[in-house]
Amino acid sequence: MRNVIKLTWSRRKRSASLDKGENIMKLAFAFATAAIVVAAAFPALADTLTVYSPQGGERGAWIAEQAKAAGHEIKLLNAGGGELYDRLIAEENNPQADVVLGMVDTSMALLKKEGLFQPYSPSWAKDLPAQYKDAEGLVHKFWQTPIVLAYYPDRLADPDAPKSWLDLTKDDYEGKYVIGSTAAQTTRMYLAGILVRFLDADGEVSDEGWDFLDRFYAEGIIANDADSQLEAFKSGRASIDLNWLGGALKRADDLDAKVQVIDTDGGTPVISEGVAIMAGTDQLDEAKAFVDWWGSADVMAAYAAKFGQVPVLPEALAKSPATVQANAKLVNTQPIDWDAIAPKLDSWLQKIELEIRQ
């Protein structure tokens, strides 16, 4: 049954009818105003922030849980660094990610070159050392991982250990070190660290560098996977480990042996994982808030306490456990311009596969 307001030309009834119409208009306006107030007080919930990251397993779960506790609803898409890189390139015209987190220097440099990131200076960036942020303000790095040269003192006396990566081709070390697959991030990074020592004036690897790498492969133990690498150490053949710091410590634990990290002449390659906001995100405010939270000193220190990773933010390192602070001082960093070598690395690795690695 409908309520109908009948308008008549009687002065009295017309007045009464208009009063009713005015009341309805006022009521409608009141409801509209109330709706606006409610909308302001309870804004629509933002969509979940999509974060692409190689951090998976326990580490990925920790990131997601801590982010949620801090008020950030994220969906963490986890895959290997190479797979994520390919996916981001494939999605360039229809980006699905809002934030990229935890990819290494070379990958971030190439993605940046493709124009996939937008500038943003996080709240913690002002205290970040210069080598961990780019001039464009696109990528900011938050922890570092040394790619170390280490040895087992029960197999190789301290005075006999190599002093430099370039010592490995000496006769004393033939058959004592293991070279992994070029598909592995660690292998790629120490090969880059070796080759940049032989760059000519044009930034290309000299013949001397390729000759060195020929000898390096000829005298090493080539093992494509973790099991065969571990077996080379278990058998007693290998005594020198070319590994990321955490991997070297884990391998020593698996072998129930002591390992010694070498602070090499010429420095140690150190890779850093970064964070960046995608240029195509439609959740810019949420992405900025997440990046501010993620790289903050308290979050980085908590991650360091949980997983032993060394943060690069000085305040975060100061709040980290003593063992993490000690690991930060183990080696001197080899100066490497990752942005400069990133576009060249794949061609170097291809040459190694086709012409050197047997």
Swiss-Prot record:
Q: Does the keyword Signal apply?
A: yes
Q: Which GO terms describe its molecular function?
A: thiamine binding; thiamine pyrophosphate binding
User: Transmembrane stretches, by residue range?
Assistant: none
Name the chain's protein.
Probable ABC transporter periplasmic-binding protein y4fP
Q: What does this protein do?
A: Probably part of the binding-protein-dependent transport system y4fNOP.
Where does it localize? Periplasm
Judging by the UniProt lineage, the source's domain of life is Bacteria
Instruction: Identify the InterPro entries for this entry.
Output: Ferric-bd, SBP
Q: Does the keyword field hold Lipoprotein?
A: no
Assigned GO CC terms: outer membrane-bounded periplasmic space
Q: In which family does this protein belong, per the annotation?
A: Belongs to the bacterial solute-binding protein 1 family.
Question: Which keywords describe this protein according to UniProt?
Answer: Periplasm, Plasmid, Signal, Transport
Residues spanning the signal sequence: 1-46
Q: What lineage does the source organism belong to?
A: Bacteria, Pseudomonadati, Pseudomonadota, Alphaproteobacteria, Hyphomicrobiales
Which GO biological process categories is it annotated with? thiamine transport
**Gene3D superfamilies per UniProt:** Periplasmic binding protein-like II
